[in-house]
């Protein structure tokens, strides 16, 4: 009989950071360019930060303050609800979550028992702004005010 050892959560997260930094070939395009600060090059350095900042069931993101950031460090990383991290990602079709294109128009929709339309418009940023500002309030109180306000400002300005 094989015995499995459960890996501590901090170690699994630290390992995933390193998999992004040194991706296998199948993930190389997705994770190309990630870097890690010197402090986190050893698991013990990451664990010290993790112990102070971890939020159970949240995921570690380094691109909350800057959507193009690919550097993991204490000043760039933040634990956020997985739904918030997904909200700020582009889905496979190249559009942000909640935005889709039909003909020349962009649509912002959400699902609540059935599909609800927020806006139909001619440009993707406006559709994303409508969707982002609709979904973001569910995270107020689940993350600190500073990152929440920063994300809200980015969505309002069309940066996200």
Where are these regions (language model features)?
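Structured segments of extracytoplasmic/periplasmic soluble domains
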Residues: 20, 49, 134-137, 141
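Short, cationic Gly/His-enriched loop motifs
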Residues: 4, 17-21, 28-105, 109-110
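Extended, polar beta-sheet/loop recognition surfaces of beta-rich domains
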Residues: 84, 91-92, 100, 136-160
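Acidic, aromatic-lined catalytic clefts of primarily extracellular/periplasmic carbohydrate-active enzymes
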Residues: 1
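A short, exposed loop/beta-hairpin motif centered on an aromatic-Gly-Thr core
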Residues: 34-37, 114-125
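Exposed alpha-helical structural elements
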Residues: 9-13, 45, 150
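GIY-YIG-like beta-to-alpha core
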Residues: 5-17, 120-124
């Amino acid at each position: 009989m094989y015995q499995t050892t459960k890996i501590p959560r901090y170690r699994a997260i630290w390992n995933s950071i390193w998999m992004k930094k040194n991706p296998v070939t199948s993930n190389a395009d997705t994770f190309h360019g990630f870097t890690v600060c010197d402090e986190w090059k050893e698991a013990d350095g990451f664990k010290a930060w993790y112990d102070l900042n971890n939020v159970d069931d949240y995921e570690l993101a380094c691109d909350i303050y800057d959507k193009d950031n690919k550097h993991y460090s204490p000043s760039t990383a933040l634990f956020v609800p997985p739904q918030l991290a997904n909200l700020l990602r582009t889905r496979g079709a190249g559009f942000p979550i909640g935005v889709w294109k039909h003909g020349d128009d962009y649509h912002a929709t959400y699902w609540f028992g059935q599909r609800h339309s927020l806006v139909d418009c001619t440009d993707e940023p406006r559709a994303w702004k409508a969707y982002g500002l609709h979904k973001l309030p569910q995270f107020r109180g689940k993350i600190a005010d500073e990152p929440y306000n920063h994300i809200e400002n980015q969505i309002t300005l069309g940066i996200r």
